[in-house]
Amino acid sequence: MLVPIVVEQTGRGERSYDIYSRLLKDRIIFLGGAIDDTVSNLVIAQLLFLEAEDPDKDIHLYINSPGGVVTAGMAIYDTMRYIKAPVSTICVGQAASMGAFLLSGGEKGKRFSLANSRIMIHQPLGGFQGQATDIHIHAQEILRMKKKLNELLAEHSGQTVEKIEADTERDYFMSGEDAKTYGIIDSIITRNTITGGSR
């Protein structure tokens, strides 16, 4: 993937950044694509860096993700909860599966979606081959993860665990308005009012 370079004029002349580093200067993290251990580690490093820079200033996590590995997503989620800096979440395009879970885990009152974004929740996916005993062990672990994710999603959305269990039995798609009613986000935004941008 080609990453754009941004050139800025400073008192010392020109300085070039890749676009993600430039966004980081404004406390913006962009989570685009599937969530795996590599992506998770990069997001966590950025969260920790911004926390160290200013623990009282908001961090803006933009999400455009189909989801990914549960443990990788949970590492991001736990870091969001661990740091003092409030993490605002913004869905751009789609937040599905673990992407939707992270969207819901943003600071209450600061979870947003753009007008035409799609949000989807479902139960964890897993596939494993091997001996019957090993398959049973992994099936039990998936059930434990499912229970934990349902409990946390219920906590963040205000829905009952029973409703979350029923709705995540299959892919459950939502518009921004649906996600707001459901409690996954707090507002739909059409203009950038959260990071100081204007048009």
Curated annotation (Swiss-Prot):
Its EC number is 3.4.21.92. It is found in: Cytoplasm. It catalyses: Hydrolysis of proteins to small peptides in the presence of ATP and magnesium. alpha-casein is the usual test substrate. In the absence of ATP, only oligopeptides shorter than five residues are hydrolyzed (such as succinyl-Leu-Tyr-|-NHMec, and Leu-Tyr-Leu-|-Tyr-Trp, in which cleavage of the -Tyr-|-Leu- and -Tyr-|-Trp bonds also occurs). One of its GO terms (biological process) is protein quality control for misfolded or incompletely synthesized proteins. Pfam families: CLP_protease. GO terms for molecular function: ATP-dependent peptidase activity; ATPase binding; serine-type endopeptidase activity. Disulfide bonds: none annotated. It is an enzyme of class 3 (hydrolase). Cleaves peptides in various proteins in a process that requires ATP hydrolysis. Has a chymotrypsin-like activity. Plays a major role in the degradation of misfolded proteins. This is ATP-dependent Clp protease proteolytic subunit. It comes from Geotalea daltonii (strain DSM 22248 / JCM 15807 / FRC-32).
